[in-house]
């Protein structure tokens, strides 16, 4: 049984420049797709870039057979399609992008930028996006997506997040919470760890998706 939980909130400004998409594949209800993007701040178009990247990558993944998505080689072309779509959109700037599927006891995907995906499988942490390249960003037309894949051993948990999560929670605390807590408690504890004392605000846009199998 797979459970999905997500949370996204802006940090330090009015508009959330993160985006996410998570849903089951239309051809296989047991194949779940997840995308998280973090629009580049400090210049125009970050929010639109993140939205376009997630939606175009989701559309590209839905156009693939579920079986094909369990092969790492399928994922760089999906992210390249998102890169091209963002580059072609006059309102869009630059963004990160993580995309993956959880299907048939594997997690497979690709990433570019500094958003992240963390797997907890059989009690052990695996930083799946550790080899990704921060630049060039999605929207440049030259983003380089690095694929990843891992087997899933129950109970498992996959966290997909923007850098507003891992930077302000810290990797040590993040892994500790992900290994110990489950369900909405994971997201609640990560929020608490990242919020500023007093104001309760986030220092950066905070987006996390948790997919769990038990």
Feature names for model-found ranges:
Residues 1-214:
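PP2C/PPM-type serine/threonine phosphatase catalytic domain
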């Amino acid at each position: 049984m797979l459970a999905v939980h997500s949370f996204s909130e802006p940090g330090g400004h009015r508009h959330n420049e993160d985006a996410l998409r998570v849903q089951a594949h239309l051809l296989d209800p047991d194949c779940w797709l997840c995308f998280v993007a973090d629009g580049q701040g400090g210049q125009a178009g970050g929010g639109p870039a993140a939205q376009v990247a997630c939606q175009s990558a989701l559309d590209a993944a839905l156009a693939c057979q579920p079986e094909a998505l369990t092969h790492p080689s399928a994922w760089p072309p999906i992210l390249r399609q998102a890169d091209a779509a963002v580059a072609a959109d006059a309102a869009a700037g630059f963004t990160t992008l993580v995309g993956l599927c959880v299907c048939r006891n594997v997690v497979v995907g690709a990433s570019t930028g500094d958003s992240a995906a963390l797997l907890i499988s059989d009690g052990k942490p695996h930083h799946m996006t550790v080899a990704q390249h921060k630049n060039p960003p999605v929207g440049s037309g030259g983003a380089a997506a690095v694929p990843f894949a891992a087997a899933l051993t129950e109970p498992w948990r996959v966290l997909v997040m923007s850098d507003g999560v891992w930077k302000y929670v810290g990797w040590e605390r993040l892994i500790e919470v992900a290994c110990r807590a489950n369900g909405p408690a994971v997201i609640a504890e990560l929020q608490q760890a990242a919020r500023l004392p007093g104001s309760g605000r986030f220092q950066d846009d905070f987006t996390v998706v948790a997919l769990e199998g038990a």
